[in-house]
Design a protein with these regions (language model features):
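N-terminal beta-strand/beta-hairpin edge segment
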Residues: 43-123, 127-151
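Hydrophobic membrane/lipid-contacting segments
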Residues: 83-92, 133-189, 223, 228-230
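Short amphipathic beta-strand and strand-loop transition segments with alternating hydrophobic
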Residues: 50, 135-137, 164, 214-217
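Small-residue helix/turn framework positions
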Residues: 97, 106-129, 163-197
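A generic structural micro-feature
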Residues: 60-62, 155-157, 194, 208
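Extracytoplasmic/luminal low-complexity segments enriched in Pro/Gly and acidic/polar residues
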Residues: 186-240
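Hydrophobic membrane-targeting and insertion signals
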Residues: 1-53, 57-60, 74-77, 235-240
């Protein structure tokens, strides 16, 4: 009799213990990807990878981190070729998740974000936020070159304005630092007068998930925005 009971209970116990370990990561990754896709209205489902270290901790709903990667997507008012969120450690309610069939997290996810903004998008942002006409933008490793025009003695000359991207009050800004007009380097004092009003600002307040951008860096052909994401809700909440 005992052998029969053991033969019945053992497979059940194995399923109870191994089931969450086997299916929970895929279920959670799918739920996160589906939620991000739906909330952002993007065409392609993002890549999601979640980690638990050691792996057995996921049975208690404890995850050490993970990442969410989106490619060629519109993040509010900025188009990115790639956006990556590195997740902070988080917990989920394992049994509520298994019972409901969708993820039940104890708190929204959070993490650090890096956004690749391509040169053509930087050019679009510059044109949208500038008071002067801009023909083109060249993003280089050591800064940004904006091609425009300056007015000297009533005549307009092609100009290359050198500077660096930065942040101020939640806006992406460009601060001019040097000027070349008609192929000639303009002295700093004159350049300061000619460059008055040539800086541009572009708001970043429409990024999803209350994202806060705290850093910007120019690289060859792109700028990198970095910051934090404080709240990425999942499919359901306890009692929800």
């Amino acid at each position: 009799m005992r052998s029969v009971v053991a033969g019945v209970l053992l497979p059940v116990l194995v399923v109870v213990l191994i089931g969450p370990y086997t299916f929970l990561p895929s279920l959670l990754e799918y739920a996160v990807a589906r939620d991000v896709k739906a909330r952002l209205g993007i065409e392609k489902q993002p890549y999601v990878e979640l980690k638990s270290d050691p792996p057995l901790r996921m049975l208690a709903g404890e995850f050490s981190g993970g990442r969410i990667v989106m490619k060629n997507t519109d993040l509010g008012n900025v188009t990115a070729t790639r956006a990556r969120i590195d997740l902070d450690p988080f917990d989920i309610d394992v049994w509520a998740t298994m019972r409901k069939g969708q993820v039940v997290d104890r708190d929204p996810l959070s993490g650090d974000v890096r956004v690749d903004v391509p040169e053509w998008e930087v050019s679009r942002l510059a044109k949208a936020g500038s008071e002067i006409p801009i023909q083109d933008v060249d993003v280089q490793k050591d800064g940004v070159v904006v091609r425009s025009e300056v007015s000297v003695l009533g005549r307009r000359f092609p100009a290359s304005i050198e500077g660096e991207p930065g942040l101020r009050d939640g806006e992406l800004i460009f601060q001019p630092q040097g000027l070349t007009a008609a192929g000639v380097q303009v002295p700093d004092e004159l350049a300061d007068r000619l460059l008055a009003g040539t800086s541009f600002e572009y708001p970043l307040d429409r990024l999803p998930y209350q994202t806060t951008i705290t850093g910007v860096e120019a690289e060859e052909g792109r700028i990198m925005l970095s910051g934090s994401v404080p709240s990425i809700p999942l499919g359901a909440y306890p009692g929800g």
